[in-house]
Amino acid sequence: MPGPSAPPPPAIYSALALLLLLTPPANAFSCSPLRLHDSAFAWDSLQLLRNMAPSPTQPCPQQHAPCSFPDTLLDTNDTQQAAHTALHLLQHLFDTLSSPSTPAHWLHTARHDLLNQLQHHIHHLERCFPADAARLHRRGPRNLHLSINKYFGCIQHFLQNHTYSPCAWDHVRLEAHACFQRIHRLTRTMR
C-alpha cells in the first residue's frame, strides 16, 4: 500500500525558495550602481582641480617630493581590491585637500565643489561593502593601506618641510592630478 503523499508546498514557499536562489550571497561584492555613475568621475574631478588650483603666480623652483606611489596596487583584476584602493585614495585626497592651510589663491567655491564630489563618491564606495565588511575594510588589506598611508604621509611631510608654501601646494596639486588618473584606472577595473 503506497504511503500518503506530501501535499505540494504552498506558493509562498516556492516564491521564497526562488528568491533565495536568485539573491546574491551577503558577502558578494556589488558595486554595480557605481559603474555608470562614476565613469566620468575622475575626469570631472580633474576639471574641478584645475578650476580650484591655478598655477602659482610666481614660478616655482624645481622641487620634487620623494614620494612614489606603489603602482603595483593598480595592477589588479580583483574588483573588491580596486574598490578598496580607490576608496582609500579618495579618503586621503579628501583629508589632504580639505586642509585649512591650502593656498589663498586657490578658489574656494571650486575647492568646495571638489570636496563635495569627493565626499559623495567616498559615501557611494563605502556603501559597496556589506555592513559586516566595514570592520574588515578598516583593518586591511594591510599592505595596501600601509603603502597608501606611506605615500600620503610623504606628501604631508613635503608640505610641512616647505612650510605649506604655494609652490609645495602646487606639487600636491600635481600629485592629486595623478591620483585622479589612478582612480580612473581602478574604476575601469570595477566595471
Swiss-Prot record:
Assigned keywords, A-Z: Antiviral defense, Cytokine, Disulfide bond, Glycoprotein, Secreted, Signal
Induction note: By viral infection.
InterPro entries for the chain: 4_helix_cytokine-like_core (IPR009079), Interferon_alpha/beta/delta (IPR000471)
Pfam families: Interferon
Span of the signal peptide: 1-30
Source organism superkingdom: Eukaryota
Alphabetical list of Gene3D superfamilies matching this protein: 1.20.1250.10
Primary localization class, coarse: secreted
Glycosylated residues (UniProt): N77, N161
Disulphide bonds in the chain: C31-C128, C60-C154, C67-C167
SMART domains: IFabd (SM00076)
GO cellular component: extracellular space
GO molecular function, a single term: cytokine receptor binding
Single GO BP term: defense response to virus
Annotated compartments: Secreted
Function: Has antiviral activities.
Family membership noted in the UniProt record: Belongs to the alpha/beta interferon family.
Name of the protein: Interferon
